[in-house]
Structures are given as structure tokens and as C-alpha cells.
């Protein structure tokens, strides 16, 4: 009996040792090495893009405070988004990150924007809170960001990350195969505009990569930086065949199609002015949903050549990565030109 009581503490010690936290070190997209205690059970995301990486990898329930790209009030959220994330009224945040609020949240880990939040990251690290910084503005950087996120979320997340990357590559390859016989000069010339009719993308923006993956050519590819303001004269010189409007902001196709100053454009004369659909995240940004942006644009650009089933791609994406079943109306919204 004495031997049993002597042995018992060692048995318990070994049992609790198995429950102890481990640690991993990751290299974030700013080049910083970040030590993270595992398992990560509570996450704050002040990066509206990075938030969606967490959801797509099956860990959205670990978010305690979250930014959502383009969303600054619950009242602006779609019915679909509120149905997808019922906790949105409790966890939504926006604006400049509040250090005191982030510390008080008790989060194990903060996800932040590498182009905006370096000072915030430094302050939090000094307080002992690890921060992962993201910078994803190309397809390769998006896939890298998803893989990075999975590396601290666990094996199930890593499996989902591999599946997502395979799906993204499959989408790009399928469109490329369908358009293999298309000559470079026959590629659709596309103007992509943002929150005003003269606010256009540059060559350094993710939207340019999406257009190219969908088989098009951006007429504003000579520009650099972020969004550029141009004049109507420049747009008339470009004379795009297709105009795509970002899925946010006030601009609608009718604003261009019915504007007398735009009537000489090829895109207007043929009626090929479209606004991208949006259900949850804007699909022109480097979020996982952007693979649907490729599919949607490819079908809009080349409806007779691209053979992928857009409806099936939409249904499968939301089911597989967001665990979300679309209504018939939502599916129609995401598949109409």
C-alpha cells in the first residue's frame, strides 16, 4: 500500500505533463519570429483580411474580438453574414486598435496588418502578447498567409489549408486550360473600379492578379501603389471592353451605363459593366473567398469558353470552408453577372 501512495504522485505528474502547453515559433509575413503557446484557444484579429483565414481553417469560434474588412457596424452587415456568424454583434470591432482593450481581452494571440500595425505589434509584444503580422497582396502571399495561420491552429487547420491551396490552384488551372487557345491580343481588356467611378486599381494590387487569373488584362496595369484617382479622359483612352465594379461602395452599373460622358466606351456600348457580388467577405480582396472572384470573373469575361460550374463552386466553397449553407436567393446573388 505504501508503494502505491508513493507511486501515485508520479503517475499524476506524468498525466498533467501531457496536458501542459507546448510552444511553436513561426515566421510571420513581416519577417518576425513569433513564439506562440499551443494550443491557441483565444484569438484577437485586428486585421480584417486575416480574420477570414481563421474562419476558413475551421477556428472562427476562437475569435474573441475581430475586424472584418469593409465592415464598421453591425447594422451594415448582410443578413447572410449575421446568419453565418451570430456572434458578430459581440465580437465585431474596427478603427485603430486599442491596446488596453486588447490586453483586457486576455487573448493568447493577436493577428494584425503588417502594413499598418507594426507599432501596435511592438507595444503588445512588450506586454508579452504575441502578434502575427500579415502582408498578402498576391496569390502566393495569400496561400502563404493561410499556411502560416494553419501552423498555429493545429492539424485539422493544416489539412484545411492544404485543401484550400489545392482548390485555388485547381481553379486557376481550370480557367487557364479553358482559355489556352486564346491569343494574348484577344484577352478581355478590363477596367476595375472601386468606391468612385474614377478610382482604379494599380499593378501592385491583388485585383490585378485576379483579373489575370480569370484570363483578362487590366487596362490600368501601368499604375503603381494602391488605389489611383484618374480622370475620365484617361479612361476614354484605355477604352476597356469590360468594367468591373468592386463589391463595396456606392457605384452601380447604371451609374456608368446611363452616364452620357461614358457612352463612347466599348464596355458601355456592349453593356458589359458589372458589379462583383458579395455575400460575406468582398471577393476582390486577398481573402479565401477570392477564389470565387476568379471563377465569377472568368464566367463574366468568357461565358462561352469557361466550363466550370460557378454555382457548384460557390456552394462547395461556403460549405467546405465556412460551414455555411446558402439559400437559393444567396446562390443566385453570387452567380449572376
Mark where each language-model region is.
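Proline-aspartate-enriched helix->loop->beta-strand connector
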Residues: 89-94, 98-115, 129, 231-248
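Solvent-exposed loop/turn segments at secondary-structure junctions
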Residues: 49-52, 69-72, 109-110, 115-118, ...
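A short, structured surface patch at a secondary-structure boundary
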Residues: 45-101, 109-114, 219
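Positively charged n-region of N-terminal signal peptides that target proteins for export
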Residues: 1-6
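Extracytoplasmic substrate-binding proteins
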Residues: 26, 33, 119-199, 220, ...
Amino acid at each position: 500500500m505504501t508503494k502505491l501512495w508513493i507511486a501515485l504522485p508520479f503517475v499524476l505528474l506524468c498525466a498533467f505533463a501531457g496536458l501542459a502547453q507546448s510552444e511553436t515559433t513561426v515566421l510571420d509575413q513581416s519577417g518576425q519570429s513569433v513564439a506562440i503557446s499551443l494550443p491557441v484557444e483565444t484569438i484577437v484579429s485586428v486585421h480584417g483580411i486575416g480574420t477570414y483565414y481563421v474562419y476558413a481553417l475551421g477556428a472562427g469560434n476562437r475569435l474573441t474580438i475581430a475586424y472584418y474588412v469593409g465592415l464598421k457596424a453591425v447594422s451594415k452587415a448582410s443578413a447572410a453574414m449575421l446568419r453565418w456568424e451570430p456572434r458578430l454583434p459581440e465580437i465585431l470591432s474596427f478603427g485603430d486598435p486599442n491596446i488596453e482593450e486588447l490586453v483586457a481581452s486576455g487573448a493568447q494571440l493577436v493577428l494584425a496588418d503588417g502594413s499598418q500595425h507594426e507599432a501596435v505589434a511592438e507595444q503588445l509584444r512588450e506586454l508579452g502578447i504575441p502578434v502575427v503580422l500579415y502582408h498578402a497582396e498576391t496569390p502566393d502571399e495569400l496561400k502563404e498567409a493561410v499556411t502560416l495561420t494553419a501552423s498555429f491552429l493545429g492539424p485539422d487547420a493544416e489539412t484545411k489549408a492544404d485543401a484550400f491551396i489545392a482548390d485555388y490552384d485547381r481553379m486557376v488551372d481550370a480557367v487557364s486550360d479553358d482559355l489556352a487557345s486564346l491569343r494574348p491580343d484577344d484577352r478581355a481588356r478590363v477596367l476595375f473600379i472601386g468606391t468612385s467611378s474614377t478610382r482604379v486599381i494599380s499593378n501592385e494590387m491583388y485585383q490585378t492578379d485576379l483579373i489575370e487569373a480569370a484570363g483578362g488584362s487590366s487596362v490600368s496595369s501601368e499604375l503603381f501603389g494602391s488605389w489611383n484617382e484618374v480622370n475620365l479622359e484617361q479612361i476614354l483612352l484605355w477604352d476597356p471592353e469590360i468594367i468591373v465594379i468592386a463589391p463595396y461602395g456606392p457605384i452601380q452599373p447604371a451609374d456608368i451605363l446611363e452616364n452620357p460622358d461614358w457612352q463612347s466606351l466599348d464596355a458601355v456600348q456592349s453593356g458589359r459593366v458589372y458589379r462583383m457580388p458579395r455575400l460575406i467577405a468582398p471577393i476582390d480582396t486577398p481573402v479565401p473567398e477570392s477564389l470565387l472572384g476568379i471563377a465569377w470573373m472568368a464566367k463574366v469575361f468568357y461565358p462561352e469558353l469557361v466550363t466550370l460550374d460557378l454555382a457548384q463552386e460557390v456552394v462547395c466553397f461556403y460549405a467546405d470552408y465556412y460551414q455555411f449553407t446558402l439559400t437559393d436567393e444567396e446562390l443566385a446573388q453570387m452567380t449572376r453577372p
